UniProtKB/Swiss-Prot annotation:
EC number: 2.4.1.123
Protein name, entry field: Galactinol synthase 4
Gene (name only): GOLS4
Any GO CC annotation of this UniProt entry: cytoplasm
Lineage of producing organism: Eukaryota, Viridiplantae, Streptophyta, Embryophyta, Tracheophyta
Function: Galactinol synthase involved in the biosynthesis of raffinose family oligosaccharides (RFOs) that function as osmoprotectants. May promote plant stress tolerance.
Amino acid sequence: MAPEISVNPMYLSEKAHQAPPRRAYVTFLAGNGDYVKGVVGLAKGLRKVKSAYPLVVAMLPDVPEEHREILRSQGCVVREIEPVYPPDNQVEFAMAYYVLNYSKLRIWNFEEYSKMIYLDADIQVFDNIDHLFDLSDAYFYAVMDCFCEKTWSHSLQYSIGYCQQCPEKVTWPEDMESPPPPLYFNAGMFVFEPSPLTYESLLQTLEITPPSPFAEQDFLNMFFEKVYKPIPLVYNLVLAMLWRHPENVELEKVKVVHYCAAGSKPWRYTGEEANMDREDIKMLVDKWWDVYNDESLDFKSKIPADAEETVTKSSILASVLEPEMTYFPAPSAA
């Protein structure tokens, strides 16, 4: 059950003179690798479930123009953002590329939108979730994470065997000097309200916050701890839940699938990694491809055909390279 939530006043100070609400989904893209396929799949998935709202792609400057054109051709709103870096540190991130994910903080500066739903590029939406935009303001909504995979081996929860997904199985030891940690969300999907005040506070807080293994996810959990409200896991099924906590999963009811487990990215899937030969995983990968390959879900441009560029979407998609990521050095936050 969610704890008592105290409302963060910085959310409320800008509400008095707002224009009519404007809503959008938003995702993040960096580099010239194949994650663009994930964003294309997400855009088509949102169309399939008849979402009423656009998909904004917050992208770093190193995303090539050919990938930007792919996304424009799929009806995405392309927004370039500058990178955000944590303070200088020697921390070892759970994944090397996580340092780039601090740049997600820029989406709080998209003040033309009153509310947004963030979705990672390796997520697919299989049922309409537009109703989440109607959740009460002034809170941060996301799905609780699972601590059972080896990527959490650095954590106290993992060493104890404690997981918030089933706290009754392994309870928090009574002899621990500290109480159980606060509820912790997965930052691959969340509902939030852009705000210049929140944005500035995020950047200022980052400057004095030591980085940690899960990068911006740890940081956001710390920053929004007092206003976090958990939502059901149907809104962000982390695939490890299928083998770690199957009793908590009703797969037929899941609306949002997060292909974050090692080897589960549909556009790279081989079935060779651990747990990837499961029938439920194969089914979910096939579902993603069904959406991605469905040409009826391609964006129908309102621009006359003779005004469109001569480069076709199919020729651009065919040029997407194998995975490659441009990494930035990590200077102090700015």
